[in-house]
Amino acid sequence: GETMFTTSDIGWVVGHSYIIYGPLIAGMTTIMYEGVPIRPDAGIWWKIVQNHKVTVMFTAPTAIRVLKKQDPAYLKKYDISSLRYLFLAGEPLDEPTHVWISEALQKPVIDHYWQTETGWAILTCAPGVEKTPTKFGSPSFPAYGYNLRLLHEATGQEVGNNEKGVVTVIPPLPPGCMSTVWGQDERFVQTYFTSFKDKMVYTTFDWGIRDDDGYYFILGRTDDVINVAGHRLGTREIEEAVSSHPNIAEVAVVGIADQLKGQVPMAFAVVKDPSRT
C-alpha cells in the first residue's frame, strides 16, 4: 500500500535509486513524473499526492525554494493526508527552507545527505527504523555502514565538535557504493582516497560540522570557499544568513575580485515579492 513519488529524472542517481530500484525492490508503487513543480501551476505535485495517495515523497531543496515563492494557497488546495514523509537531498538544506516547508506541510521533513558515488544516504535519521528527533538544517547521523570522520583539511587530524572539517569515510564503503571507475581503477583510488597524506579514507569533498549532540551539518563543497583578506569563508554560511530574510526565496553567493581584499562575496538573490523591495 506504499506509494513513492520521487521528482527526479532517471538520468540522475536519485532517479535510479528512488524511482526504480528502491521502491520496486520494496514492493512499492512508484510514480515517474516529467515536469517542473509550477506547471501548469504550483499545486501540481500536491495534486499528484492527492490523486495517487502518495505516502512518501522525495525532492530537492531547490524545488522547495521554488515553491516557497508561490501562492501558499496551493498547499491547502489538495488533500495530502496520505503523505507520511517528505525527504529532501541533493544539496545542503538551509534552515529557513527546512522550517518553512515543515510548517507548511505539517508533515515530517527528512533531510539526508549522500552522493552519486554512494547511491544512498550517508547521513540520515532513518525514520523507518527508529524515531529520532531531528534538527532543522541537519541530515542527522551517519547511516548504517558508514564510519564517518571529519578531518582537518591541512593536517588530516580529526576535528572536534563544532569545528569544520572535510567529510570522509573510513573504508570499506558499505554495499551500494561506487567501487571503481569503469576500466580505471587507479583513477578511482587517486580521486577519492588520496586527499590526506598517510590516510586511506574516502573523501566526499564536502565540508561538515558536528554539534555537541552528534548531529551533522553539511556546509557545502570544499571548493566553494572565498578568500577575503586572508579569511576563508564558505559560501553556504553566507547564503543561509541571507536566505533567513522573510522576503528572500533563493540566493547564491560567489566571490568577485577586489583590489583591497583579493575577493569579496557578492550575493544574487531572488525575492518572493518584488513589490516589497
What are these regions (language model features)?
Residues F141-G145, Q157-T194, L233:
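Conserved ATP/PPi-binding loop(s) of AMP-dependent carboxylate-activating enzymes
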Residues S82, R187, N247-E250:
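Glycine-centered tight turns that cap/initiate beta-strands
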Residues Q50, M57, P174, T180, ...:
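AMP-binding/adenylate-forming catalytic core of the ANL superfamily
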